[in-house]
């Protein structure tokens, strides 16, 4: 005599098996998507690094060729005037300083990615630091007839930071503004206190601007925006990622507001002496 179980038992078993298979299929699908995304990310990272190495090779060759060329001229020419010696040695010094800056940029990125870069925290006069940085870019701005405006809020408290690294951030932002602002353009620098122990330094230019995807690329180490305009300008693509990392190491932030064809505004936020009792990365407005 044959016996049969209840229909609801068979239905529950089928539903259970179906749910189990469906769950496995969903999991496998998610894993496949994750692997595909990881593969694409790895390929993009590899491509970016390859492009960076190719570009960096060109950047390194430029000052090296200048050093070798002017050194050869000093070595070959027997009857050379003191004025020429002074001129050539000046070119060699400039090229060597440029080469050192490139190498330091590579080392900084390596330290940042390895978590080995540290910053000091001491009271700093931000307007004085800004003035010294403006002197560095002044000649280039004048050469392009760029108007540079500054607006510093009175009574600004001292910031807490590493003098060398804060200057590195400011010089990068100012240098980029001059580089990407066309002749007879305008750059405006604003320094103002924020609430709860922070200060903001904003650099706004009337340059070519960036799309959201280009901003994302510019903030990525080894990422460079592939445009004809950028290819006409020297650069390693390390400046903004380093500046962002340094701002975060200080307990601050770096933000970019840019629109294609409408210029760029970069704001770096740094803690002031009022934030000594606050935790880094908190209460940032």
Predicted regions and their residues:
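Helix-loop junction within the histidine kinase core
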Residues: 110-121
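Conserved catalytic submotifs in the C-terminal HATPase_c
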Residues: 120-125, 142, 147-157, 194
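Short alpha-helical segment of the dimerization/phosphotransfer core of two-component systems
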Residues: 94-99
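Short helix-loop "hinge" at the ATP-lid/N-box region of the Bergerat-fold HATPase_c
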Residues: 177-178
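Primarily the dimerization/phosphotransfer
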Residues: 36-76, 87
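Short helix N-cap motif at coil->helix boundaries in the Bergerat
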Residues: 126, 209-217
């Amino acid at each position: 005599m044959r016996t049969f179980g209840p229909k609801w038992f068979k239905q529950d078993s089928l539903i259970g098996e179906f749910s189990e298979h469906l769950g496995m299929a969903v999991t496998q699908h998610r894993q496949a998507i994750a692997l595909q995304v990881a593969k694409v990310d790895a390929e993009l990272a590899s491509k970016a690094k390859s492009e960076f190495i190719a570009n960096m090779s060109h950047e390194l060759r430029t000052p090296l060729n200048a050093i070798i060329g002017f050194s050869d001229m000093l070595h070959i020419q027997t009857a050379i005037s003191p004025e020429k010696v002074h001129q050539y040695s000046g070119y060699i010094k400039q090229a060597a300083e440029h080469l050192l800056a490139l190498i330091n940029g590579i080392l900084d990125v390596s330290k940042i990615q390895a978590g080995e870069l540290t910053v000091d925290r001491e009271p700093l006069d931000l307007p004085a630091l800004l003035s010294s940085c403006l002197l560095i870019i002044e000649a280039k701005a004048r050469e392009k007839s760029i108007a540079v405006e500054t607006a510093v809020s009175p009574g600004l408290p001292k910031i807490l930071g590493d003098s060398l690294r804060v200057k590195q951030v400011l010089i990068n932002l100012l240098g980029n503004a001059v580089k990407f602002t066309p002749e007879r353009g305008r750059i405006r620098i604003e320094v103002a206190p924020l609430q709860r122990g922070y200060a903001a330094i904003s650099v706004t230019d009337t340059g070519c601007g960036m799309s959201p995807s280009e901003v994302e690329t510019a903030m990525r180490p080894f990422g460079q925006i592939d445009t004809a305009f950028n290819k006409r300008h020297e650069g390693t693509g390390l400046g903004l990622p380093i500046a962002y990392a340094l701002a975060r190491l200080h307990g601050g932030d770096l933000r970019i507001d840019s629109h294609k064809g409408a210029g760029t505004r970069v704001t770096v936020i740094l803690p002031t002496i009022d934030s000594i009792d606050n935790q880094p990365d908190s209460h940032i407005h």
